[in-house]
Amino acid sequence: MNPTITSNRNPRIVEARKLDQRKHRQQQGRFAAEGLQLLHMALDSGARTLEVFFCEALFVGDEAPALLARFRQTDAEIFAVSPDVLRALSERESPQGLVAIFSLIEKSIDSLAMTGGELLIVLDRPQDPGNLGTILRTADAAGASAVICITPCVDPFDPKTVRSSMGSLFNLPIIQTADVTSLFAHLDGFKIIGADAKHGEIWTRCDWRNGVALVLGNEARGLSDDVSSYVTSWASLPMSGKAESLNVAIAGGILMYAWVEANLTR
C-alpha cells in the first residue's frame, strides 16, 4: 500500500491539481471528478479510472467506503492523502473524501450507431460550463443519444461542467467537431430543428416525431449563420414577460421534452 500523501508539493498532487486547467487536461489526457453519486455513475459507465485520492477522515457514513471498495476492484492507483491535501484537490466547499482521475472520453460522430429515430443535441459553440453540464444532465434524462459540440467551445471536462452534469457526462457520448459540413452530412434523414426566440413555429406545433437533431445556439450570439443554413425548421419559445431571453439550458430542456412527449408511444 502506498504511504499517505501529506504534502501538496508531492508530484502526483501537483499534476492532479493542474487538471483544473484545460491545457493540462488535454496534455495529460485525463480529468478529475468527485461527488459520491457522480463517481458511482462513472464506475457504472465503465469509464477508465487512473488514480483515486481518498481521505478516510473526511468520510461520512458508509457510502464513501463502499465506493472506495469499488475503485479497488479497478486498475486505478489508490492513494491515501491527508485532509489538507484532499481539500486542495477538491472543488467542493465540503469534500466527501474522494477525488478520482479518469481518462478523457473521446467520441466521434462515426462511432454513433444511429437508426434515425434518435434525439441528438447539437450545441453551436457553447461557452458556459455550467450551462453545458445542465444540458448534458437534461439530455441524459430525456433519452438523447448524444450531445454534439461545435468547436471552439467550452471544455466538456471543465470541473464546473463535470459537476453540473451530475454524472450524465459519463452516460452520454459527447462529440466535439469543427467540421460543420461533415456533421450535418451525417445527420441526413434527421429533422434539424433550431431554437429561436423570435421566429419559427411555436414549439408545441413543431413535428418532434422520430429522429430530431435539436440545435441550440451560443449563449451570447445565438446560432451562427453557417449552422443556421442547415436548419430545416425553427421552434420558438414565446415570452409574455419582460425578460429578453431564456437561458439556453432552460430552453433546451423544454424542447427536449417536446421530443419525449411526441415519442412516448414509439
Regions found by a protein language model. Give the residues of each.
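N-terminal positively charged helical leader segments and presequences
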Residues: 1-93, 189
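Amphipathic alpha-helical repeat scaffolds
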Residues: 35, 128-134, 246-251
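Short, ordered loop/turn segments at secondary-structure junctions
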Residues: 57, 151-154, 220
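RNA substrate-binding interface of SAM-dependent RNA methyltransferases
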Residues: 44, 70-73, 79, 84, ...
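Glycine/charged-rich beta-loop-alpha catalytic/anionic-binding loops adjacent to active sites
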Residues: 22, 113-121, 230-239
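Structured adenosyl-cofactor binding patch, chiefly the S-adenosyl-L-methionine
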Residues: 138-142, 153-169, 225-266
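Active-site/ligand-binding-proximal alpha/beta "capping" segment
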Residues: 193-243, 247
